[in-house]
Design a protein with these regions (language model features):
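Outer-membrane beta-barrel transmembrane domain signature
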Residues: 103-190, 194-197
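Residues that define the transmembrane beta-barrel architecture of outer-membrane proteins
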Residues: 6-8, 40-42, 80-84, 123-131, ...
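Transmembrane beta-strands of outer-membrane beta-barrel proteins
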Residues: 9-13, 23-29, 57-63, 100-108, ...
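Transmembrane beta-strands of outer-membrane beta-barrel pores
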Residues: 28-34, 62-68, 92-94, 105-109, ...
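Gram-negative (and chloroplast) outer-membrane scaffold detector with strong preference
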Residues: 47-70, 74-111, 126-137
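Short loop/turn motifs that connect adjacent beta-strands in outer-membrane beta-barrel proteins
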Residues: 20-21, 55, 93-100, 139-149, ...
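Residues on the lipid-exposed face of transmembrane beta-strands in outer-membrane beta-barrel proteins
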Residues: 12-16, 46-50, 86-90, 131-141, ...
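Extracellular loop and loop/strand-boundary signature of outer-membrane beta-barrel proteins
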Residues: 30-34, 71-75, 116-123, 162-165, ...
Length: 221
C-alpha cells in the first residue's frame, strides 16, 4: 500500500572549523507533515569533524530524534530515538561539477509504543547503512563554495540490518533536486524538492513523501 503525502522540512547546518583539519558539525532539522499542518519529526545532530585531506572528511557523532504521529501510517505515540553514527565523505571534481560521496553507518536506539501492550514502550536497537551521492554545479562560472548561484542533485539509499529489524530492510530511498545561493564563503541557502520512498516496518506499507526542503548552511572558519 502506497500513501502519497506532502511535507515541509527546514534544516540549519553549522560546521565551524577550529584549525585546517579539525572542526565540528551541528545540524537542526524541523520536519512538518500534511503540508506543514502537523509535526513529523525534530532532529538534532552534533559531531567532531576531521579533514585529513581536502577531499576527505571523517566524523563520529550523535543524533537525537523525536517522532510524532502523522500521515496514513502514524506511529502509536510520540517517541524518541538516540543514534550514534560514523561517517566518511569523499569529494571530487567532475568538470565544473563538485561531487560528494557520503557513507554513513548508524546505531539506533528507539522506544516506540508496544504493538501488543497499550501504554507500554518497547526498546528497539537496529543498525542502518546509508549512501548518498550529490553533485553541485555553479551557475555563474564561479568555483564551487564561492559566492553565487548553483544547482544540486542527490540520491540516497538506506538499508537496515540487525536482529531487531522488521520487514523493512530496504528502509528508504531519497531523490533530490534544488537550487541555492552561496551568499558568502561562510553562508548559503538552498531550496529544493525531495521525493522520499519510506518502507514501514511491516514491509507492505510505503510512504511516497513529496517534500519541499529549505536549508541554511553556516560554515565559519
Amino acid at each position: 500500500t502506497f500513501a502519497s503525502q506532502r511535507h515541509l522540512w527546514l534544516t540549519v547546518n553549522a560546521e565551524p572549523r577550529f584549525s585546517e583539519r579539525w572542526g565540528t558539525r551541528a545540524e537542526l532539522i524541523l520536519r512538518r507533515a500534511e503540508e506543514g499542518r502537523t509535526w513529523q519529526q525534530v532532529q538534532f545532530r552534533v559531531a567532531p569533524v576531521w579533514n585529513p585531506r581536502r577531499d576527505l572528511q571523517v566524523s563520529v557523532g550523535y543524533l537525537f530524534s523525536r517522532t510524532f504521529p502523522y500521515g496514513r501510517f502514524p506511529v502509536r505515540r510520540v517517541f524518541n530515538e538516540h543514534r550514534l553514527y560514523q561517517q566518511l565523505v569523499l569529494r571530487s571534481a567532475l568538470g565544473r561539477f563538485a561531487v560528494a560521496h557520503r557513507y554513513r553507518v548508524e546505531q539506533r536506539w528507539s522506544r516506540p509504543a508496544s504493538a501488543t501492550e497499550p501504554g507500554r514502550y518497547t526498546s528497539v536497537f537496529t543498525n542502518r547503512a546509508r549512501y548518498q551521492a550529490r553533485a553541485m554545479l555553479p551557475l555563474a562560472g564561479q568555483v564551487a563554495a564561492t559566492p553565487g548561484p548553483y544547482t544540486a542533485v542527490s540520491t540516497e539509499v538506506f538499508v537496515s540490518f540487525g536482529a531487531q529489524v522488521g520487514r523493512n530492510v530496504f528502509d528508504q530511498f531519497r531523490a533530490y533536486g534544488g537550487c541555492g545561493w552561496q551568499l558568502t564563503k561562510a553562508a548559503g541557502i538552498e531550496l529544493g524538492y525531495l521525493q522520499q520512498i519510506n518502507q514501514q516496518s511491516n514491509g507492505t506499507n510505503f510512504e511516497r513523501n513529496h517534500t519541499a526542503q529549505l536549508t541554511f548552511n553556516i560554515n565559519p572558519n
